[in-house]
Amino acid sequence: MPFDLRDHTADVAVEATGSTLADLFAAVADGLAAASCEAIPADGGHTDFAVAVDAEGLEALLFDYLDQLIYERDVRDVLPVDHRVRLSPPDQTVESESDTAADTEEDWHLSGTYRGVPLASIDAREVKAVTYSEMRVEETATGWSAYVVFDV
């Protein structure tokens, strides 16, 4: 999944693309892992973990997903890598009692898995937080793109 790390004053930014929204979210998460550790060990001696988040919009969902991964790192003492993501969009309309369609405020849902690499086995720098600064999620002619800034 393609992503590039971008220099950002006192922070690090990830610019990612994906042919689908799920691919995009996984690519940004892989970029977060790359921002944390230059050499991620190959598959071996790891544990798989599940993650799930809900949010009202795509940027909020991406923020909450990345924030959850940082939390998982801190609580489980692992670096989340090799992300697999599934997204479910909110229902767009419901029938009301007057038989007219009305927009709903239901949330997007993300469920996924990642491989947890023990932090004790790698030389990782701490990514403190995801930010909304300059964050964007956009549909493009070839799929989706995102830009996310992390506080380091």
Question: Which residue stretches match the model-derived regions?
Answer:
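Intrinsically disordered, low-complexity regions
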Residues: 2-152
